[in-house]
Design a protein with these regions (language model features):
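PRY/SPRY (B30.2) beta-sandwich protein-interaction domains
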Residues: 2-219
Length: 219
């Protein structure tokens, strides 16, 4: 008796709702929830000695119990090389937020003293350790700071409560892997929203939440 062998057919993987409010991945009719970015506790993503203290399901970062006069740096669990990405931050105090290649030294003393990253705080931006934007609108405790980053061309936009406040066209490479980053100081905190439960403000057209469903990854 002869037997016929047929190649196994696999269902196609399709995206569902993968815009700014990315929700699910469909695989053969089965919905798979994507993983959204959080704040990383990995050694490679946090400053040695002065490591940020994470809470709120790893979405809020603060300093250690006895921080002294020291900045505490960290990055997110997920990052990207290219694409258009959006996330939100609610600050208390004058902590710093930004984005940097993961090749950057996370153990540096000052967050804004980087050789390749973007850092912002209260109306200014520094790129590669140099001040490139200053004197713009300050943010206040409890504001929603929207960050839109075009990893294809290096342009970063900062929104305060839904209104564009300032931006900068950097020359950050679109061939290096990068992650959102931050630094907190004594008494200051940052709470991040990566879109898992939706954003407080509407992302700019074409910008997506940082999730595996949208193509973000750990490395």
């Amino acid at each position: 008796m002869s037997m016929l062998w047929y190649p196994k057919e696999y269902p196609l993987v399709t995206m569902a709702g993968m815009g700014g409010g990315a929700t699910s991945l469909q695989h053969g009719g089965v919905v798979i929830d994507p993983t959204f970015a959080k704040l990383s506790s990995a050694d490679a993503d946090t400053k040695d000695t002065w490591t940020p203290v994470l809470s709120n399901n790893d979405l809020t970062a603060g300093p250690s119990a006895s921080p002294g006069s020291n900045w505490h740096h960290g990055r997110t669990t997920l990052g990207f090389t290219t694409g258009k990405w959006y996330w939100e931050v609610t600050p208390t105090g004058n902590a710093m937020i930004g984005i940097e290649p993961t090749s950057e030294n996370i153990d540096r003393e000052f967050f804004n003293d980087s050789s390749s990253g973007l850092a912002s705080r209260d109306g200014w931006i520094q790129f590669e350790g140099n001040e490139v934007v200053s004197g713009q609108s300050d943010w206040s405790d409890g504001d929603t700071i929207g960050v839109a980053f075009n990893a294809n061309n290096g342009t970063i936009y900062f929104y305060i409560n839904g209104s564009l406040s300032y931006s900068y066209d950097s020359t950050m490479s679109n061939s290096v892997f990068k992650k959102p980053a931050y630094s907190v100081y004594s008494g200051w905190t940052l709470t991040f929203n990566f879109g898992a439960a939706g954003f407080d403000e509407t992302p700019p057209t074409g910008y997506q939440a940082i999730s595996t469903g949208n193509g973000a990854s750990e490395s």
